[in-house]
Amino acid sequence: MRRHLPFLAALATAVSIGFDAEAGPLSDAAARAESQANTGDTAAAWETLRQAVSDFSQTLPFAIGKAVFVAAAPVGYAMYEPKQDSTFKAGEKLVSYVEPVGLTWKKAGDEGKVETRFTVDLEIMNPDGDVLASQKAFGDFTFTGYMRNQEIYATLTVDINSAPAGDYVLRYRFNDINSGESATVDQPFQIAAQ
């Protein structure tokens, strides 16, 4: 075993050098931001990281990052109170907090602004996948600003007061208008017997 130690040490060094060489733009930006922060330029460090994440997000496929039932409408991004379970009383509204990721941005009409837009289709199904109700473009969201904001969420509220007690699946299909891509998320839920 001792005769293999120099070889293993050389291999470990080669592997770590390989990883350093392949670090990529996010690692490079993090190093720049750390250097900026160490010299007291907090604003520049923050902007460096924000721009790097914004650029990286454009390489991601469109997807849903988080989808949860919430006890009340959120007050901001990641500022929500999750519902303790997915059982609802008859007549209780289903409120979902959903974070799309990998949105495509394009130039907006105003100088220097960018815009993203997505629609949300809705289906309510039984556990076997049979569609009981549906609506295209249930939600339509447009975000315009001076940067490709990553802290985007949708609050979706569904009123199911006529549904009988039982198990269901709420399916949202998010449609990124700028890329033509779609992402689907299912939220199983139950209507309690009265």
Name each model-derived stretch.
Residues 1-8:
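Bacterial N-terminal signal peptides that target proteins for export
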